[in-house]
């Protein structure tokens, strides 16, 4: 099922509710903790670049390239709750800053969408783990957004503060991906948004340490 969002006039207003329908239906019953990585293209591309990580951990990837947080919120039940997740690791928001749906970026809206997903986790006995946005500083498909790094830092600061107040695990991938200026190093991302295999490998270690 494709759901068209009925607000704004942007280019990408589709929620791909059936993207993972077959994969979800094929999942065996969970016989232990079920960790779902949830997000956008960064999560979507992770299993392709580092399939051995998912094979060794049993983690489930449910990312969709290009999605904003509003789209992720709409498919949250199908791709997190209904597949029996016990832990949800969220990484998203850069496409909100990139205005992928064509609407102006409003930090309060993105922040509220993420908090709504945290609330859904708590209501369904799922442990939420929130990842800060990667410290991107150039969005190649939206070059007119010249302050992406500042917007990333601002949203991350709010998410980190919320997590600290409410006892939610917060993962700062910038710790292992950024240089002295706080921006992602080209050693770990060719376009400053999406990690390469080396970047994912560094993220994996921090993720596993954070889930202990």
Model feature map: region roles:
Residues 3, 134-212:
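Catalytic His-Asp segment of secreted/periplasmic serine-dependent ester chemistry enzymes
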Residues 8-89:
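Serine-esterase "nucleophile elbow" of acetyl-processing enzymes
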Residues 38-40, 92, 131, 171:
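Active-site flanking residues adjacent to catalytic metal/cofactor-binding acidic residues
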Residues 49, 100-106, 133, 141:
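Metal-dependent catalytic neighborhoods of phosphoester/phosphodiester hydrolases
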Residues 62-65, 92-93, 97, 101-102:
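Cell-envelope and extracellular/periplasmic
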Residues 70-81, 108-115, 119, 201, ...:
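Amphipathic, non-transmembrane alpha-helical secondary structure
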Residues 91-97, 118-152:
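Active-site segments of SGNH/GDSL-like serine hydrolases
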Residues 105-115, 149-155:
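Charged helix-capping and loop-helix junction motifs
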């Amino acid at each position: 099922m494709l759901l068209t969002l009925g607000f704004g006039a942007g280019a990408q207003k589709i929620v791909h509710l059936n993207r993972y329908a077959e994969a979800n239906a094929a999942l065996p019953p969970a016989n232990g903790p079920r960790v779902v990585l949830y997000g956008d293209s960064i999560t979507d591309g992770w299993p392709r670049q580092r399939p051995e990580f998912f094979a060794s951990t049993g983690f489930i990837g449910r990312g969709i390239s290009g999605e904003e947080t509003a789209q992720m919120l709409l498919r949250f039940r199908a791709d997190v709750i209904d597949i029996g997740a016990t832990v949800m690791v969220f990484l998203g928001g850069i496409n909100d800053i990139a205005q992928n749906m064509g609407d102006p970026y409003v930090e309060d809206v993105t922040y509220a969408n993420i908090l709504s997903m945290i609330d859904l986790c708590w209501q369904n006995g799922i442990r939420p783990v929130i990842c800060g946005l990667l410290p991107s500083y150039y969005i190649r498909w939206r070059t007119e957004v010249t302050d992406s790094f500042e917007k990333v830092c601002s949203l991350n600061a709010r998410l980190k503060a919320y997590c600290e107040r409410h006892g939610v695990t917060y993962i700062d991938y910038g710790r292992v991906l950024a240089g002295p200026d706080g921006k992602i190093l080209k050693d770990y991302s060719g376009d400053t948004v999406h990690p390469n295999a080396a970047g994912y490998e560094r993220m994996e270690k921090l993720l596993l340490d954070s889930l202990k």
